Curated annotation (Swiss-Prot):
Function: Colony queen number, a major feature of social organization, is associated with worker genotype for Gp-9. Colonies are headed by either a single reproductive queen (monogyne form) or multiple queens (polygyne form). Differences in worker Gp-9 genotypes between social forms may cause differences in workers' abilities to recognize queens and regulate their numbers.
Protein name, per record: Pheromone-binding protein Gp-9
A single BP term in Gene Ontology: response to pheromone
Family designation: Belongs to the PBP/GOBP family.
GO molecular function, one term: pheromone binding
Keywords: Behavior, Disulfide bond, Pheromone response, Pheromone-binding, Secreted, Signal, Transport
Gene name for this UniProt entry: Gp-9
Organism encoding this protein: Solenopsis xyloni
GO cellular component terms, A-Z: extracellular space
Major site of localization recorded for this protein: secreted
Length: 153
């Protein structure tokens, strides 16, 4: 019985450490063009918000508008280099395809619906940088809510 409890404790600790590590990662840092886009915008990794900060919405209250805009410009740069965006316009179909490929989401998955909702909510925004950050924040927040609801189920 002690061994079983120890295994559960170790599993819970590893799961928590993994989730904490992901939330500490910088938004977009897993993508190929991250460093290029940082350089193009004169930013460093320290200037970019963490996934946890964005998914919880803390980035909106903890940072100045210029920091929000700069982070958005890096997101837009990566989306554009990946062919998902041109200026302030999304390629919605390609964005869905890439999202499905990246997440392994299946038809009917709530994450795809969340992406569609986030694209719809931001599609008329004119500033490409603000639009990109708000889209990324919307998707990350939706994923966090969906993950929390599936853990409680």
């Amino acid at each position: 019985m002690k061994t079983f409890v120890l295994h559960i404790f170790i599993f819970a600790f590893v799961a928590f450490a993994s989730a904490s590590r992901d939330s500490a990662k910088k938004i977009g840092s897993q993508y190929d063009n991250y460093e290029t886009c940082l350089t193009e915008h004169g930013l460093t990794d320290d200037d970019i918000f963490s996934i946890g900060e964005v998914s919880s919405g803390q980035h909106k209250t903890n940072h100045e508008d210029t920091e929000l805009h700069k982070n958005g410009c890096v997101m837009q740069c990566m989306l554009e280099k990946d062919g998902l965006m041109s200026g302030a316009d999304y390629d919605e179909e390609k964005m869905r395809e890439d999202y499905i490929k990246e997440t392994g989401a299946q038809p009917g998955d709530q994450r795809i619906e969340a992406l569609n909702t986030c694209m719809q909510e931001t599609k008329d925004m004119e500033d490409k940088c603000d639009k990109s950050l708000i889209l990324v924040a919307c998707v990350l927040a939706a994923e966090a809510v969906l993950a929390d609801s599936s853990e409680g189920a």
